[in-house]
From Swiss-Prot:
Ligand binding (a 1,2-diacyl-sn-glycero-3-phospho-(1D-myo-inositol 4-phosphate)): W77, R86, K167, R170
UniProt source species: Drosophila melanogaster (Fruit fly)
Keywords: Cytoplasmic vesicle, Golgi apparatus, Lipid-binding, Membrane, Phosphoprotein, Protein transport, Transport
Protein name stated in the entry: Golgi phosphoprotein 3 homolog sauron
Compositionally biased tracts (Basic and acidic residues): 37-52
Ranges where the record places region Beta-hairpin required for oligomerization: 186-197
Subcellular location: Golgi apparatus membrane; Cytoplasmic vesicle; Cleavage furrow
Principal cellular location given in the protein's record: Golgi
Chain positions covered by the region annotation Disordered: 1-52
Phenotype of the disrupted gene, per the record: Lethal. Embryos display an aberrant pattern of denticles with some additional dorsalization and twisting. It is associated with a defect in heparan sulfate proteoglycan synthesis which in turn alters hedgehog signaling.
Recorded name of the encoding gene: sau
Length: 294
């Protein structure tokens, strides 16, 4: 991998800022609060000049880590990335203020038994997220995070829940990355059939992603999950759950690799229930983490 550093500039449309301001002035209090939540989410997720980079969702970042640069497809042996991408979708919806975990109540129910409930049905503009949001909105009674990961993956024995499966997720995410200029599209022949692949076309974007993950557990390690950027914390967990985090650490020397993996294991060994109960914790994150480690 070419580890050269750089910036990928994107145009910032003036109407986006203007639209946000106009919405705050003209809409109802609920709309205003939602707009404020969205703006706060963007501020939380953009640091160190990320506004000048190609913006990727958690799903796109995990898929990009899993794709082979030249071949343009994920490992045939990776059977974890499918459910991992569904976990990304739930966390994205949580970070964008669309869903939340119900309150623990007087009985202090655990994360794994509490339901995922709708917070706002305002569309995100991302087709996959909005499709999942629609399913969550139409489901009554609500389901747990673990159940939703299974339903969205199509890994359920309940035939009535198969309609919730999100289909062709990897291909749809790859097309998003093609539109953003990160990947390209090719046809490759595999003996008896042709296969659409998506080789890397912008090495800078992937290098920045890999470096960002490496820095989070090395030079920028804070040793406190509550102080970590929530999106980066989610990316580390979900990359591990999707069995692609090794691709981010492969370029490291032996000493740095050992330190990085040790710190990832420290995160995996946390008490998720205790972390979710701390002030300002995002319960969606910890509920998804628990679903993948139970």
């Amino acid at each position: 991998m070419n580890r050269s550093d750089g910036l990928v500039r994107r145009s910032v449309k003036p109407r986006e800022n203007g639209g946000a301001e106009g919405g705050l002035n003209a809409n109802t209090p609920d709309d205003n609060q939602d707009a404020l939540d969205n703006l706060k989410d963007q501020e939380d997720n953009i640091d160190d000049g990320d506004s000048k980079e190609t913006r990727l969702t958690l799903m796109e970042e995990v898929l990009l880590l899993g794709l082979k640069d030249k071949e343009g497809y994920t490992s045939f042996w990776n059977d974890c990335i499918s459910s991992g991408l569904r976990g990304c979708i739930l966390i994205e919806l949580g970070l964008r203020g669309r869903v939340m975990i119900e309150k623990s109540g007087m009985r202090r129910r655990g994360l794994c038994t509490r339901k995922l409930i709708l917070k706002s049905d305002q569309q995100t503009g991302d087709v996959l997220l909005d499709e999942a949001l629609k399913h969550i909105k139409e489901t009554d009674p609500p389901e747990t995070v673990q159940s939703w990961i299974e339903y969205l993956s199509g890994e359920t024995w309940n035939p009535l829940k198969l309609r919730y499966q999100l289909k062709n997720v990897r291909e749809r995410l790859a097309k998003n990355l093609v539109e953003k200029g990160v990947l390209t599209t090719e046809k490759q022949n595999f003996l008896l059939f042709d296969m659409t692949t998506h080789p890397l076309s912008d090495n800078v974007v992937k290098c920045r992603l890999v470096k960002k993950i490496q820095d989070s557990v090395l030079s920028k390690w804070v040793n406190d999950p509550q102080r970590m950027d929530k999106r980066m914390l989610a990316l580390i967990f979900l990359a591990h759950a999707s069995d692609v985090i090794e691709n981010a650490f492969a370029p490291l020397n032996d000493d740095d690799y050992e330190v990085a993996m040790k710190r990832v294991r420290e995160l995996l060994d946390l008490d998720f229930e205790a972390e979710s109960a701390k002030p300002n914790a995002n319960e969606i994150l910890w509920a998804v983490f628990m679903a993948f480690t139970k």
